[in-house]
Amino acid sequence: MGKPRPHKKKASKTREKSVLSAGGSISKRKMNEDPRKLLEQATILLQTGQADAALSIAQQALEIATSNSPAQLSSLNTIAEIYVELGEIDLARKHFLQAVELDPTGSIPESEGGGAEKFLWLAQLSELGGKDSVQWFEKGVGALRGIFRRSPLFFIAFSRASYQADIFRWEEDAESRCENLITEALLVQPSSPEVLQTLASIRISQLREDDARAALSRSLELWKDLPPEDPHVPDFPTRISLSRLLMEVSMLLEALEVLERLILEDDQSVEAWYLGGWCLQLLAEIGEAPRDPEAESNETPESKRHASLVASREWLKQSLMLYDLVQYEDERLKEHALELVEAMNKELGEEMEDDSNVEDGEGEGEEEWEGIESDSDHEMADS
């Protein structure tokens, strides 16, 4: 499952203001800032759900970046992606188009802010759709081919390409074009987790779930036993997407293991806690519980269901607590989490205040965590 097309919101005048319009001038301190460091800060904020704060810092980077420099190009792309996260599609498109003006063919290296990703985003965000989307997509693919055999970063960007598969559905050769792209990628890098996830996403869209499961299993085997700092471990967003794909093909235990590992790496991720809670709720529906070597072998489906529901509620409550704490901005996620918790409260009863402490992870909640420990497109929240 790929990243869902974001909903369009009315552009916020406040968000559109630049640093100059807000203050009239840029302070000497800001002039001395390194745009690259500011963009690193903005990226971290975006990944932790603080899109508005990320936008402010990325705009600072753009204002102090030298004209026609890699920093300016990187700033435009980062700001555009933040606007996508905020649902400000017109502003996102505007900044991606400005980035295209600086790198019209995608020949500038990704390390300098160039590459194909802006074309792939514009394909997804096209107002006209149809042929306009296809033209942007194929421009992106052309840029990707230019770096195909030179850079492993291709595979990160290629994963984005799969998200555009839907725009080809109106064409007769849609499936063959997607197949050609994924085959090309697999020939060059058959052991890339990102490419295997892309293959799984395409197989899911083709209703070939067994093939999707096989691709996801291969992707997991490549890195699941590696330490977190190993460079072969996919980045955090890629593994979030992986967990969604695993859930979509009912590989729930595998999805939960991925999410548990993500929480160990970043326990402030609203989306990881939410997906883990949802995954546990799905396990409860089929009378299953997380793997636990110490669990009694004669556990009944009812006891497994109860254990999964209790754990699910804890994960979801932690997600909701962090949602408010970091001012996360995905209303659909919050609504779905609240809906799930409400349903669990009806079955389990309202939780006592001192039963667990989700804020500091102590007490009964921590014991439940130890029992399940093994080491965001919001598309699924609509299902």
Swiss-Prot record:
Region: Disordered, residue numbers: 1-33, 345-383
Highest taxon of the lineage: Eukaryota
Main location group: cytoplasm
Disulfide cross-links: none
Biased composition (Acidic residues): 350-374
InterPro entries: TPR-like_helical_dom_sf, TPR_rpt
TPR repeat residues: 35-68, 73-106, 116-147, 193-226
Subcellular location(s) of the protein: Cytoplasm; Nucleus
Pfam families assigned: TPR_12
UniProt keywords, alphabetically: Chaperone, Cytoplasm, Nucleus, Repeat, Ribosome biogenesis, TPR repeat
Biased composition (Basic residues): 1-12
Gene Ontology biological-process entries: cell division; ribosome biogenesis
Cellular compartments per GO CC: cytoplasm; nucleus
Family indicated by similarity: Belongs to the ACL4 family.
Summary of the function given for this chain in its UniProt record: Acts as a chaperone for the L4 ribosomal subunit, required for hierarchical ribosome assembly. Shields ribosomal protein L4 until timely release and insertion into the pre-ribosome is possible, once ribosomal protein L18 is present.
Protein name: Probable assembly chaperone of rpl4
Organism encoding this protein: Emericella nidulans (strain FGSC A4 / ATCC 38163 / CBS 112.46 / NRRL 194 / M139)
